[in-house]
């Protein structure tokens, strides 16, 4: 068995490719089931965010298992393998484990140290558990990855001052507005007429950062006004008008800055829509949705500037340099956590022998106990029988404790295999203990 990950991210694929592979939560169960239906895939878990899609698997054969995942991605995205392959990365076992640790710690994020990825990995684990696509191996790996992400954030300063995708989007708006005025600086948003489309987690973060950057008011649009209103109540100091998506054209006509972050299959803003409006001023659109909420043809519309998540790199680079040293400190923690998981993985090699040893001793215990109880006769009470039963079980557990602990303790594989062979021979257990390749 092997752990493997196949995926793509902002580092390997542009947003127009990433959006084709995005897997929304409502189709996650079907996607996980499709993966698990393949004979090579024993466990599967999917991480789908605006900047990455990664599929973690436990497979029988690494080459065949990875090929199955690649076929799934090609079928899901509608992209031919030759078009998709240049954007994919693949990591095997040790590298796959290390990659997940880096991702969860925020070291592989567009925004170094951002905290949202930790919640997204937690969600990946929860969905895998709910849909029964992960078993003991990936469950252990994901649990340790989440623990590692928390540890990195508590034991280093990586999360101090970290920006998120949403805060980077707001800073990008400030930067572009400043540049349009001849200033290479972040300017206040106080005079901008601002709209936010969507009322999910990303929109919540947008409102939080817009308020911090001086926005005097925001129009919040969503399919259901009730959800927008519920979100608005969390920002009593920021004037928010809640509207339905029916008012989107009006907002595009009157606002100077529009952020979009809503779950859609197709863009909700395109050139035809904008050209049909009677606009009198410039419009800046910032789209942090994946799949994209704004079509690429809006660049052709006069007076309109549009940016997507890939354009956030300009802001990110202004914040990254000072954080690189902290990231290097975090790498040491990741190496330690990765080693701990691999030690646990290696210890699984001993499980078949341990199970056979336990079964052999249990068979002896039951046989000898049965003989002893038959000699005690009918005068031996049920309570006394239970006491003797517990006594013999306790003795077996005491006898097994030290050898089992030693067999599963961290050690060189050759040493463990030698110890397993000795146990197999001494106790005359079945040969051919299963091993981890």
Swiss-Prot record:
The active site is at 50 (nucleophile). InterPro entries: 4pyrrol_synth_GluRdtase, 4pyrrol_synth_GluRdtase_dimer, 4pyrrol_synth_GluRdtase_N, GluRdtase_CS, GluRdtase_dimer_dom_sf, GluRdtase_N_sf, NAD(P)-bd_dom_sf, Shikm_DH/Glu-tRNA_Rdtase. Keywords: Chlorophyll biosynthesis, NADP, Oxidoreductase, Porphyrin biosynthesis. Substrate binds at residues 49-52, 109, 114-116, 120. The record marks 99 as: Important for activity. The keyword Oxidoreductase applies. Signal peptide: none annotated. Its EC number is 1.2.1.70. It catalyses: (S)-4-amino-5-oxopentanoate + tRNA(Glu) + NADP(+) = L-glutamyl-tRNA(Glu) + NADPH + H(+). It comes from the Bacteria. The keyword Lipid metabolism does not apply. Pathway: Porphyrin-containing compound metabolism; protoporphyrin-IX biosynthesis; 5-aminolevulinate from L-glutamyl-tRNA(Glu): step 1/2; Porphyrin-containing compound metabolism; chlorophyll biosynthesis. GO terms for biological process: chlorophyll biosynthetic process; protoporphyrinogen IX biosynthetic process. Pfam families: GlutR_dimer (PF00745), GlutR_N (PF05201), Shikimate_DH (PF01488). One of its GO terms (molecular function) is NADP binding. Catalyzes the NADPH-dependent reduction of glutamyl-tRNA(Glu) to glutamate 1-semialdehyde (GSA). During catalysis, the active site Cys acts as a nucleophile attacking the alpha-carbonyl group of tRNA-bound glutamate with the formation of a thioester intermediate between enzyme and glutamate, and the concomitant release of tRNA(Glu). The thioester intermediate is finally reduced by direct hydride transfer from NADPH, to form the product GSA. Homodimer. Possesses an unusual extended V-shaped dimeric structure with each monomer consisting of three distinct domains arranged along a curved 'spinal' alpha-helix. The N-terminal catalytic domain specifically recognizes the glutamate moiety of the substrate. The second domain is the NADPH-binding domain, and the third C-terminal domain is responsible for dimerization. Belongs to the glutamyl-tRNA reductase family. This is Glutamyl-tRNA reductase. The gene is hemA.
């Amino acid at each position: 068995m092997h752990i493997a990950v196949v995926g793509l991210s902002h580092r390997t694929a542009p947003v127009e490719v990433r959006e084709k592979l995005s897997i929304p939560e409502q189709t996650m169960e079907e996607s996980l089931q499709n993966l698990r239906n393949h004979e090579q895939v024993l466990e599967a878990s999917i991480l789908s965010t605006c900047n990455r899609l990664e599929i973690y698997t436990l497979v029988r054969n690494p080459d065949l298992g990875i090929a199955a995942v690649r076929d799934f991605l090609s079928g899901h995205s509608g992209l031919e393998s030759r078009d998709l392959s240049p954007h994919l990365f693949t990591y095997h076992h040790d590298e796959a484990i290390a990659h997940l640790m880096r991702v969860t710690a925020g070291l592989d994020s567009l925004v170094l140290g951002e905290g949202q990825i930790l919640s997204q990995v937690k969600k990946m684990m929860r969905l895998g558990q709910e849909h029964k696509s992960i078993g003991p191996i990936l469950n252990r790996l994901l649990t340790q990855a989440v623990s590692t992400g928390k540890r990195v954030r508590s034991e280093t300063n990586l999360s101090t001052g970290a920006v998120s995708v949403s805060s980077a989007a707001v800073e990008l708006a400030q930067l572009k507005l400043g540049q349009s005025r001849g200033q290479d600086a972040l300017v206040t948003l106080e005079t901008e007429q601002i709209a936010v489309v969507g009322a999910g987690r990303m929109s919540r973060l947008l409102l939080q950062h817009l308020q911090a950057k001086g926005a005097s008011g925001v129009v919040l649009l969503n399919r259901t006004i009730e959800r927008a209103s519920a979100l608005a109540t969390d920002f009593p100091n920021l004037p928010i008008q809640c509207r339905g998506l029916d008012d989107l054209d009006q907002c595009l006509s009157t606002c100077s800055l529009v952020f979009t972050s809503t779950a859609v299959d197709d863009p909700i803003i395109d050139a035809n829509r904008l050209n049909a409006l009677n606009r009198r001023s410039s419009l800046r659109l910032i789209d942090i949705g994946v799949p994209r909420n704004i079509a690429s043809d809006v660049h052709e519309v006069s007076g309109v500037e549009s940016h997507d998540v890939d354009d956030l790199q300009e802001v990110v680079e202004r914040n990254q340099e000072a954080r690189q040293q902290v990231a290097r400190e975090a790498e040491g923690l990741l190496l330690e956590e990765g080693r701990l998981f691999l030690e646990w993985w290696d210890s699984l090699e001993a499980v078949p022998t341990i199970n056979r040893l336990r079964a052999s001793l249990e068979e002896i215990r039951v046989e000898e106990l049965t003989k002893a109880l038959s000699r005690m006769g009918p005068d031996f009470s049920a309570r006394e029988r239970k006491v003797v039963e517990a006594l013999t079980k306790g003795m077996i557990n005491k006898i097994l404790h030290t050898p089992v602990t030693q067999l599963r303790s961290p050690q060189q594989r050759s040493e463990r295999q030698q110890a397993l062979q000795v146990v197999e021979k001494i106790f005359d257990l079945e040969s051919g203990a299963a091993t981890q390749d």
